[in-house]
């Protein structure tokens, strides 16, 4: 991933504005409705995981959600690591992510089958096939580990 091209400038809480910090954007809150700088904060994709890769020089802005205020940072969206059906996991393929119906909650691969960053039916691109699943699927599905990226809308 070319980080220079994919950098997004946004705002985050001053107390956790450090290079290397990763977070999942949960979306705006009611307090954001009338904020004059909300467009800068809310341009991230809800549910996506980001990493802070740069700090911007600038003033601390007041924010009702962050006691210390917010500052400008540069972030990149991180790839999503997930288990994908081996029949459709081809590098460069555009697929609709389908969450498996599974009740084996104690499975060590459950979070790979159900990544919190993705919604059912979301269009993604298989960036890279990483390899075999860490273990056999207890439901008998043929899956492999892949790096996914949301398709541009």
Curated annotation (Swiss-Prot):
Coiled-coil ranges (or none): none
Name the record gives this protein: UPF0179 protein AF_2154
Family: Belongs to the UPF0179 family.
Organism expressing this protein natively: Archaeoglobus fulgidus (strain ATCC 49558 / DSM 4304 / JCM 9628 / NBRC 100126 / VC-16)
UniProt cross-references to InterPro entries, sorted A to Z: UPF0179 (IPR005369)
Lineage top rank: taxon: Archaea
